[in-house]
A protein has these predicted regions:
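Metal-dependent phosphoester/phosphodiester hydrolase catalytic core
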Residues: 1-7
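Metal-dependent phosphoester-hydrolase catalytic domains
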Residues: 7-21, 28-158
């Protein structure tokens, strides 16, 4: 999967100058696995936003892990944590960027979780456990991406 996504990203980057790419999904790999770190993000033009996050999107036994990920083109990544204040847009303007990643998070709303009687703590509230309907939502927690999208006309007038 990582190789197919890499070829697709390369193709888009050849026909478009600085495209805004968002790749999202359950990769069945951790951000640190070779398929994501080397194959998909190895050129440095794509960034895995989930890398370094503390809590996971799914839980196997007592361990949280991150299989659900957002990978974006580097030109969407903010230069620093103050990049969204008005006076910090000048640097981005030179790069003709108008879409930024403002925030990424794993949604951990209480209704998405249940107590884990076997291993302690909490785990995602599943829809099914085998063939048995549990009434929950998923065995993975959802992830959310907050983007700052600037209209070019509005963007360049500042």
């Amino acid at each position: 999967v990582a190789e197919v996504l890499r070829r697709t990203a390369d193709s888009l980057m050849q026909v478009r100058q600085h495209p805004y790419l968002i790749i999202m999904g359950d990769f069945n790999d951790y951000p640190s696995n070779k398929s994501l770190r080397k194959v998909l993000c190895g050129k440095g033009d794509l960034v895995n936003l989930m890398e370094g996050m503390k809590k996971g999107t799914y839980r196997y036994r007592a361990e949280w892990g991150i299989f659900d990920q957002f990978i974006v083109s580097r030109n969407m990544q903010a230069k620093n944590k103050n990049a969204f204040t008005k006076n910090k847009y000048a640097k981005a303007k030179k790069e003709n960027a108008s879409v930024f990643v403002k925030n990424v998070q794993i949604l951990r709303h209480p209704f998405l979780l249940e107590e884990d009687d076997k291993y302690g703590g909490q785990k995602p509230f599943r829809t099914y456990n085998g063939m048995k309907y549990m009434g929950g939502y998923s065995d993975h927690l959802p992830i959310a991406l907050d983007l700052l999208i600037r209209d070019d006309k509005d963007y360049y007038s500042r």
